């Protein structure tokens, strides 16, 4: 039997709760039967920094892969040049895969000329807005292969990687840029009957006719205060009798130094609305319960690379309300002139966020209500 290839993964510690960590976990566990993995698991202040953890035996037992191999090196930050050099020598990976904003990896691109002589550099990339980030072109040049998480990202990188206007820029071949959207585990996120005690815990023992669900970090670009204001206006529009049977469930921290004091927002603009905070960190199957409790999941972030919560919501059979931005567009299933848009279409289209051009022309699937921001002026 041929020896499995080994991949050195540079990303958020896959045991953590960030979107990058969650997708790192899904990527590793979904391919652990094909590849061996060594991860530099990043966190801001990692409590286990510097100690290699071999979790291979646990993976073998829990996932039934007898030859599974996974080691994690917890680290403060995403690493550095000396660490990668050391790991190349000790672990001898067949490829390096890094994941998240390229600005965190400038130190890696600075040494690409020595690394790529023996080990290819792979990049799992996302970019959430136009115009095309020309300043990233040199970073993309440093990678042997780029997997694009959204169709918009694919269009951006295909356009930029075709440029050859500088001496060091070489257009990439077709196989070097691929559309690889996040995968949602359908064994976890699916329509299911929610246990009565769990529903009671989330909704405080009350019965509601309509449950709107929001699941994000309490940070400004996610616009949680705007969600509260929108819910308040919705309640005003339908009248008190119906509004009393509606609730907004916000799975987030009510107060965050990087975001907003949401209880204060509620007191100021929506004191009479039913708004519940779900603060407890939940397991994946419990998050699936949340989606199944909801009648709709909303994400109106002003910039969004992908939007895991709404993608998981769709798989649970719950419709979504989303801003037309970044990767959220992919989840709407847009058709233009009767044709379902593909990643290749975005090479020409760029993005559908210009409401004057696309509202009414781009038709979503029945599971999605797209929201175009009228503040985006067509140029």
Feature locations, PLM:
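Nucleotide-activated donor-binding/catalytic signature segment of Leloir-type glycosyltransferases, i.e.
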Residues: 259-281, 285
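A short helix/loop element that forms part of the nucleotide-sugar donor recognition site in Leloir-type
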Residues: 163, 189-205
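Conserved donor-binding/catalytic core segment of Leloir-type glycosyltransferases
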Residues: 9, 205-222, 228-231, 248-249
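Aromatic "clamp/platform" in nucleotide-sugar-dependent glycosyltransferases that forms part
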Residues: 302
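Carbohydrate-associated surface elements
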Residues: 152, 183
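N-terminal subdomain of nucleotide-sugar transferases
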Residues: 1-57, 91
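Conserved small/polar residues in nucleotide/adenosyl-binding loops
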Residues: 377-379
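Short hydrophobic beta-strand element within catalytic cores of glycosyltransferases
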Residues: 319-322, 339-348
């Amino acid at each position: 039997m041929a020896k499995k290839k080994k991949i050195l993964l540079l990303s958020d510690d896959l045991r953590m709760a960030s979107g990058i960590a969650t997708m790192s976990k899904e990527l590793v566990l979904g391919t652990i039967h094909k590849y061996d993995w060594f991860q530099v698991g990043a966190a801001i202040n990692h409590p286990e920094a510097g100690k290699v953890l071999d979790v291979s035996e646990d993976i073998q037992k829990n996932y039934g892969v007898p030859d599974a191999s996974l080691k994690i090196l917890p680290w403060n930050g995403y690493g550095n040049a000396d660490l990668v050099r050391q790991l190349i020598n000790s672990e001898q990976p067949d490829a390096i895969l890094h994941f998240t904003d390229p600005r965190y990896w400038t130190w890696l691109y600075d040494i690409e000329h020595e690394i790529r002589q023996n080990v290819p550099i792979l990049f799992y990339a996302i970019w959430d807005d136009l115009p095309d980030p020309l300043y990233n072109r040199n970073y993309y040049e440093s990678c042997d292969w780029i997997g694009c998480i959204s169709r918009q990202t694919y269009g951006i990188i295909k356009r930029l990687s075709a440029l050859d206007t500088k001496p060091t820029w070489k257009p990439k071949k077709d196989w070097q840029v691929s559309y690889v959207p996040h995968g949602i585990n359908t064994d976890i996120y699916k329509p299911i009957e929610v246990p009565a005690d769990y529903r009671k815990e989330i909704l405080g023992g009350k019965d509601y006719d309509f449950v709107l669900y929001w699941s994000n970090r309490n940070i400004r670009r996610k616009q949680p205060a705007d969600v509260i204001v929108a819910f308040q206006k919705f309640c005003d529009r339908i009248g008190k009798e119906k509004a009393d049977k509606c609730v907004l469930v916000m799975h987030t921290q009510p107060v965050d130094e990087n975001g907003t004091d949401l209880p204060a927002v509620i007191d100021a603009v929506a004191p009479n609305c039913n708004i519940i905070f779900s603060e407890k960190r939940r397991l994946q199957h419990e998050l699936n319960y949340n989606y199944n409790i909801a009648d709709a999941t909303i994400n109106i972030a002003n910039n969004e690379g992908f939007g895991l919560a709404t993608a998981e919501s769709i798989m649970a059979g719950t419709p979504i309300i989303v801003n037309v931005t970044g990767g959220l567009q992919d989840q709407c299933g847009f058709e233009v002139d009767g044709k379902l848009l593909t990643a290749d279409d975005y090479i020409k289209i760029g993005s559908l966020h210009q409401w004057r051009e696309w509202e009414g022309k781009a038709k979503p699937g029945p599971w999605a209500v797209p929201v175009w921001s009228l503040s985006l002026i067509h140029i």
